[in-house]
Amino acid sequence: MSVVIRLARAGTKKRPVYHVVVADSRFPRDGRFIERLGYFNPLMPKDNEARLKLDMEKVKGWLAKGAQPSDRVARFLDAAGVKKREARQNPIKAVPRKERKAQAEAAAKG
């Protein structure tokens, strides 16, 4: 059973509130879950303490059991200092070729 810590949408139309839940990865986004760990209200100001509420003891327990956080939950945990978020792959899109690099250096010198 692959267990994830993720957000489940709640609230009304155009007024979302998200529950932070532990669920099997095969369950629907807003469907069955194992345990509710907290909530996230994106409509509140960013500096408001009630914007994100997590039970850190339960979160640490589930991480110790091997639960994988979703991307957004990983950001929350990184901000809280619970788990360091891995850097994402950022490939270098356009590396100049050698001759263009040499031309750019020559133009910069004089």
Curated annotation (Swiss-Prot):
It holds the Pfam family Ribosomal_S16. Residues 87-110 are annotated as: Disordered. GO terms for cellular component: cytoplasm; small ribosomal subunit. InterPro entries: Ribosomal_bS16, Ribosomal_bS16_dom_sf. GO terms for molecular function: structural constituent of ribosome. One of its GO terms (biological process) is translation. The keyword Ribosomal protein applies. Keywords: Ribonucleoprotein, Ribosomal protein. Gene3D superfamilies: 3.30.1320.10. It comes from the Bacteria. HAMAP family: Ribosomal_bS16. Belongs to the bacterial ribosomal protein bS16 family. This is Small ribosomal subunit protein bS16. It comes from Bradyrhizobium sp. (strain BTAi1 / ATCC BAA-1182). The gene is rpsP.
